Amino acid sequence: WTMGHMVNKKYQVDEFADLGANAIEFDVTFDSNYKADYTYHKVPCDCGRTCGRYEVFTEFLSYVKNETTPGHPSFREKLVLLQLDLKMSYLSESQSNEAGKDMAKKFLNYYWNRGSNAGRAYILLSIPSISNYLFLTGFKQQLKTEGYEQYLDKVGVDFSGNEDLDSIVNVLGRLEDEHVWQSDGITNCWTRGISRLQDAIKKRDEDESRYGIKKVYTWTVDYYSSIRYYLRLGVDGVMTNFPNRVEYVLKEKEFSGSLRMATMDDNPWEKYVG
């Protein structure tokens, strides 16, 4: 999976898809009532990028629905995953729960269209901290309450705050969620050690728990040499500002025989067996 990073404007969806991204990551902020309001990343952000661009969240969601709905004139077949970077670390457990319920309602109304001509992409909810875990509970509860439990097949979770992996695994067990990604990374302005990333990959490969890690990705990776390095480590995904560079590297002899871009036929909630 190649996740285009900080895709917070409508036109950037097309821009990053044209560069080869099969997934986009966008930021989501919340208002004082814990409702998703904008696709916005404040200053600072990645080096070489312009911070502060945004759309109204529901308008953005409707736009990407069209981009991921077969038969729509704007449909992009290769765009198969939407990742939400949820800016909610300051919310309490109960507030996180309410935010999750609101998010589910917005997806039902503006993306899944309550079952009529719905967007088909997989959804990855990147939650900043395990202290916000009730966001996922609220999200699931709302879908079940409204009778749309089937959409849970499309939704996965990622705790993105570089927290202790054992603590994350414990929370995942309580959540009883099988659709688990694990991230590790830092802004492209800095470098980061790989010990935690290697530990996440090891847990993915060795932990047979039903609620264990299924995919591991790293962020934000922009240099060709770094992309090669992380692919050799065994990541499933790379978040980048330059999806075309990942696409280029995947075509190189070293990787072309064993790795390729994921498609809609690839289940993001299952471990890859190469």
UniProtKB/Swiss-Prot annotation:
What's the name of the protein? Dermonecrotic toxin LspiSicTox-betaIII1 B
- Look up keyword Coiled coil and say if it applies: no
Q: Which organism is it from?
A: Loxosceles spinulosa
Which biological process annotations from GO are given for this protein? killing of cells of another organism; lipid catabolic process
Q: Can you tell which superkingdom this protein's organism belongs to?
A: Eukaryota
Q: Where in the cell is it found?
A: Secreted
- As recorded in UniProt, its EC number(s) are 4.6.1.-
Q: What is its main location?
A: secreted
